[in-house]
């Protein structure tokens, strides 16, 4: 049995993910889905899982905690970000939006995104929980009127009453990540079966020699 856990990006996606995982469950692969905000203690107790699916800060923390484990990144793409920016514009009508996330490769497309959502955009790097708090504070200081971000920053904004739009991951992106994890789990299961067969053959050989 190979154990797989997915950290749901948001609580409202737990139901959808649960339905999807029930369809994929097999005798060889066992799925679980959970959601936690911030840096919960549970991250230190995942040794019994063979494959983990996570995004953002949680993903980076898990890579540091479990360097030898199979960890699938659940990342949003440009379409997800643009959808959130347009939703932010419709909801809050801001002239300045702080885009708070780990922004590899985003600088090049920032002018285009700014034009599409008709607002000034500024990037704020978020790598961990402390930098998430720092990013929200920097947005206040810089006069940003709203924020577009992932889960940790969104929760901070909700606590502080700062206008914020959460970047939702499309179902297709979720399904691709889960399929990738399922394929990895199948490979792990196959390798374990091979190892068990070899071990059995060696044990039988030893018994034959002793006889």
Model-identified regions with their sequence ranges:
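A short, well-structured beta->alpha microelement
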Residues: 26-47, 77-86, 119-140
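Structural motif
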Residues: 6-12, 33-37, 54-57, 75-78, ...
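Sensory modules in modular signal-transduction proteins
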Residues: 191-211
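Short hydrophobic/aromatic-enriched beta-strand-loop microsegments
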Residues: 29-31, 69-77, 118-125, 163-173
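Short, low-complexity N-terminal regulatory "tails/caps" that precede and couple sensory modules
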Residues: 51, 101, 142-148, 153-193
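N-terminal basic/disordered segments at the start of proteins
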Residues: 2-22
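Short, charged, surface-exposed secondary-structure boundary motifs
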Residues: 16, 80-88, 109, 131-136, ...
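Helix-enriched interaction subdomains in cytosolic or periplasmic regions
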Residues: 42-76
């Amino acid at each position: 049995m190979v154990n797989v856990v997915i950290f749901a990006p948001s609580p409202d996606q737990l139901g959808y993910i649960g339905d999807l995982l029930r369809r994929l469950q097999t005798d060889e692969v066992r799925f679980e889905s959970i959601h936690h905000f911030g840096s919960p203690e549970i991250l230190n107790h995942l040794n019994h899982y063979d494959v983990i699916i996570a995004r953002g800060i949680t993903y980076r923390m898990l890579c540091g905690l479990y360097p030898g484990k199979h960890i699938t990144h659940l990342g949003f793409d440009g379409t997800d970000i643009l959808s959130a920016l347009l939703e932010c514009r419709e909801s809050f009508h801001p002239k300045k939006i702080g885009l708070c996330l780990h922004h590899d490769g985003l600088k090049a497309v920032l002018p285009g995104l700014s034009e599409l959502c008709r607002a000034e955009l500024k990037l704020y790097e978020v790598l961990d929980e402390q930098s998430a708090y720092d990013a929200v504070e920097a947005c206040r200081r810089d006069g940003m009127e709203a924020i577009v971000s992932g889960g940790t920053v969104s929760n901070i904004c909700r606590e502080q009453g700062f206008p914020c739009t959460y970047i939702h991951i499309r179902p297709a992106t979720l399904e691709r990540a889960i399929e990738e994890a399922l394929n990895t789990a199948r490979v792990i299961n196959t390798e374990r079966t091979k190892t068990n067969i070899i071990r059995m053959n060696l044990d039988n050989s030893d018994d034959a020699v002793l006889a």
